[in-house]
Regions:
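Extracytoplasmic/secreted proteins, especially bacterial periplasmic and envelope-associated proteins
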Residues: 6, 10, 15, 28, ...
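Structured segments of extracytoplasmic/periplasmic soluble domains
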Residues: 10, 14, 29-36, 63, ...
Length: 146
């Protein structure tokens, strides 16, 4: 487990064996790697014993001179076209009534991968878990790897 620079270049070189990344980043990285090396072996999955999920956020400046521009941007993101655009970038649509073309759907992980994914409810606990993850991996996984 590498908690440092998880760039496409390092993944492609094989310097990173396991990386913990958001699904859309992982799928995008895999796409880039496969374009450069179609024989590469790069698997993306959501841990079946549990994972976290999070949504995007938007910061809207309440002092802006154009307050409706942010509203229009949000309207686009939630529109069918906006949701499709996000899915083309490997992000799962937040709306479940959006019809995705088969070629776009094929580039996303199947819904059943997210069965045990949960939202972060305690940010402080999450921050601590992230801090402890690398050492726990070394002690509890790497130490027993052969």
């Amino acid at each position: 487990l590498d908690m440092g620079d998880t760039s496409v270049a390092r993944l492609e070189k094989g310097e990173i064996e396991v990386a913990v990344l958001w699904d859309y980043n992982s799928l995008g990285y895999r796409s880039q790697i496969m374009e450069n090396n179609p024989d590469a072996n790069f698997e993306v999955s959501v841990p079946s014993d549990g994972a976290i999920q999070s949504g995007y956020c938007t910061i809207i400046n309440k002092y802006t001179k154009r307050p409706y521009a942010a509203a229009v941007a949000r309207e686009y993101i939630f529109s069918d076209e906006g949701q499709l655009n996000l899915a083309k970038g490997y992000a799962r649509p937040i709306r479940d009534d959006v019809e995705l073309p088969e070629d776009v759907k094929a580039n996303l992980l199947p819904d059943d991968q997210y069965t045990n994914a949960r939202f972060i409810e305690d940010q402080e606990a999450w921050d601590q878990a992230v801090e402890d993850l690398s050492s726990s991996w070394q002690e509890e996984v790497v130490a027993y790897a052969q």
